């Protein structure tokens, strides 16, 4: 297999250090890709690119016919539940600008990290949840103004990394419009059964991320490079009523090889 094709949405993380977003979209379109999760990353597409580059990305989307599933960013660098108000303010301010960019680009959703606790001396759960809920109050207002959905992603480094914990947290917050981007790889890495994770988040499932990892080392490797079993996911997604494309979030220095190979592996499993 020499091209990526249109079976999956493709996250552009692997291209953030080598291509501008507009160039990347044309490259992916030439590979047969029809849906993209657009990363917002300095040098690829960033909040400072509000003029010609943002217009170039919009033109690339129009020219190629690619549809954006969502916009995403390097959430490990941001923290909406940080102990310092200054760090929370920077993180929230950037996310507000990401939402505005999503609206300009025609992306329906922003992928949001729930925030992190200091692993050496964490804030109390009550304080973390308070920061989280206050952050959601602010970001939800901006998202609603722009017609953008927020998909919270399960992340191993988040203060709430698991499917049930996220569902319980969102139930306490009480906003039915908040959805979850369930990353099966992140679920596997923390010891969760991602099949059960998908079933748990089904009422809020907005998007699914795919890549491979082991439980020993955290990766987003090509399919087959880790020890995950992907065979059960198509049936579970059908049970959950999920009808969107899954997004391949493989992070690789050789995406021209690893994306087509990953697609080939998954197609043999019934995707």
Task: Please name every model-derived segment.
Residues 37, 70-72, 111, 151, ...:
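Conserved beta-strand positions in the central sheet of alpha/beta enzyme cores
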Residues 14-16, 40-42, 74-77, 114-118, ...:
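Active-site-proximal loop/turn and secondary-structure-junction residues that shape catalytic pockets
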Residues 1-107, 137, 175, 203, ...:
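N-terminal pre-domain/capping segments
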Residues 21, 47-54, 85-88, 92, ...:
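Flexible, glycine- and charge-enriched loops at secondary-structure boundaries
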